[in-house]
């Protein structure tokens, strides 16, 4: 779910080129996405953070009787704070829009691995990008959070 139709088109093209039998629903507004979440059960959801109130959708997906694994996607809200909030609200992964070309292996990991393994693998894939974008010390302001999170995901099996 993204407010930019061109991003949805790229996601659809990337996913369907590797998984042509995959069924995709798309929404360009918070209201459309909320209606879809209320009406259907999904194996996975991808929410843009900024334009479609992605954090609100993430909370809704997590409160369902059978929570939906969610990947948060962003360009405008790309920050250590939004990554932290995504984790706190239960996202299974966080992907910068600049990495859309790598979305399929990323989604395969989310569908295949347990929470800790997904985050370990996801952070390993984007750590260089984050260090380049935010600087090598981006975890420093919330050092205790990141230390606790890294311990949590290290203790979970694959």
What are these regions (language model features)?
Residues 45, 70, 94-95:
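Two-component signal transduction core modules
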Residues 56, 77-105, 123-124:
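Alpha4 helix (beta4-alpha4-beta5 surface) of REC/receiver domains from two-component response regulators
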């Amino acid at each position: 779910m993204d407010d930019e139709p061109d991003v949805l088109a790229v996601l659809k093209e990337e996913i369907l080129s590797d998984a042509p039998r995959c069924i995709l629903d798309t929404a360009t507004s918070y209201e459309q996405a909320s209606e879809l979440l209320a009406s259907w059960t999904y194996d996975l959801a991808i929410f843009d953070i900024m334009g479609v109130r992605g954090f609100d959708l993430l909370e809704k997906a997590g409160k369902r009787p059978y929570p939906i694994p969610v990947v948060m996607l962003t360009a405008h809200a790309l920050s250590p704070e939004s990554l932290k909030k995504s984790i706190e609200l239960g996202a299974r992964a966080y992907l910068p829009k600049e990495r859309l070309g790598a979305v399929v292996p990323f989604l395969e990991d989310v569908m295949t691995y347990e929470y800790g393994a997904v985050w370990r693998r996801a952070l390993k894939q984007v750590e260089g990008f984050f260090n380049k974008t935010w600087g090598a010390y981006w975890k420093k302001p919330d050092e205790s959070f990141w230390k606790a999170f890294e311990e949590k995901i290290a203790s979970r099996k694959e």
